[in-house]
Amino acid sequence: MIGLVGRKVGMTRIFNEDGVSVPVTVIEIEANRVTQVKTLENDGYTAVQVTTGSKKANRVTKPEAGHFVKAGVEAGRGLWEFRTEGEEFTLGQEINVDIFADVKKVDVTGTSKGKGFQGGVKRWNFRTQDATHGNSLSHRVLGSIGQNQTPGRVFKGKKMAGHLGAERVTVQSLEVVRVDAERKLLLVKGSVPGAINGNVIVKPAVKA
């Protein structure tokens, strides 16, 4: 079963049958339109490419426009690809949120909020150094980042200050609380990566 591309609407809460408040993220999943079907013979692997939403005509490049026209679908806000195994798809086919009707848990992938350049305390949860007792300059600095003559360098991958966020993040095994096919909404328990209105990819959970 493939996944779908949606839009993070925001968070709210609903009450279950026992009256317990459940925090949920609302994901709007409009119909995903098939723009290309990749086959083993032509592409070396099997996959389906989809788009969703819409894009202003003056924002669509000529190569994109030709691609959408060939598929016979309206220009969407992006292109995403899902590997397939035995499933049959046709150009222009629409795939809706109701494919998750019988799914218990999903994996959600999004782009995390960008935080810019951050220090080691915020980025890697380093502990701070002493606030007093003679420390006047090094409260939030990293401390030692290597040794001396041996090895005489800083190892690659050392946790240091740098750019935080704005990267692809996947949260696994989120419980599907509700599928509202009429309003094209999927409610999952807990939070998902990214800002409001950000694109998210929803797939059946790998570890479910």
From Swiss-Prot:
Superkingdom of source: Bacteria
Keywords: Methylation, Ribonucleoprotein, Ribosomal protein, RNA-binding, rRNA-binding
Modified residues (N5-methylglutamine): 149
GO molecular function per UniProt: rRNA binding; structural constituent of ribosome
Transmembrane segment boundaries: none
GO cellular component: cytosolic large ribosomal subunit
Keyword Metal-binding: no
Modification after translation (UniProt): Methylated by PrmB.
Gene3D superfamilies, A to Z: 3.30.160.810, Translation factors
GO BP of this protein: translation
Coiled-coil blocks: none
HAMAP family xrefs: Ribosomal_uL3_B
Subunit structure: Part of the 50S ribosomal subunit. Forms a cluster with proteins L14 and L19.
Family per similarity comment: Belongs to the universal ribosomal protein uL3 family.
Function (record text): One of the primary rRNA binding proteins, it binds directly near the 3'-end of the 23S rRNA, where it nucleates assembly of the 50S subunit.
Annotated NCBIfam families: L3_bact (TIGR03625)
Protein name as annotated: Large ribosomal subunit protein uL3
